[in-house]
Amino acid sequence: PAGPIAAVASRVGLDQFDVEKLEGKTAEDIRWLNQVAVRHNDIIRQAARSSPVLPLRLGTIFRSKDSLLAAVAHCRKAVADFLQALGDRQEWAVKLYVQNDRITGRLDGPHLNDAVMSGAEYLRRRGAELRRCREMQTELQREITAVEDRLAARTDRRRRVRPLPDALTGRREKMVYNAAYLLPAADVEPWLATVHETRDTMQKKGLLLEVTGPWPPYHFCPELTISASESTSK
């Protein structure tokens, strides 16, 4: 505890968070890092059940208890202002996936039986495919904007996040939208009703809408200035 603010921390060995080890990204290191990330998230979510929290980035290491307390003292006002403004607000994650190739406009290469086409005919067909691709992408962006505007109406803040690559999602569908929404606890139920209505509408258009939460406010935290003498962040 540091006055009205408390820090939740655990002891780790600096050798476990060695930069070269993390940058090496061996299969064993990735499995270990995934386990650490899950544990890190679990602790933050447990703390968030009883109090507003300001999550620090995974891998933020304080070299001693004194350096941790010094960092808390240095950032006390920024942390206190954020926690007071946060109140009971919750972060919810919204992701949108393309269910099939119809709306993405993915283009295949020429088929084997197209080899007999003349050059002019090939260029004509290819041009038509490219125009269709642009139209599909425009339609997709229009749908994404419609989803975002509708869901943002009941939220305080929203933030777009880079969509995850297929290798990380483990899904056949391609993620085309990834965002975090922050809203008061009292507004969650009606907001989720809007999400479910929107999900049903999007599914008819070949899009899958996914919502998860509540989460700690990972994407809405202020940047804290912590000197190198107080901590090291990998």
Where are these regions (language model features)?
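An interfacial alpha-helical scaffold signature
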Residues: 1-234
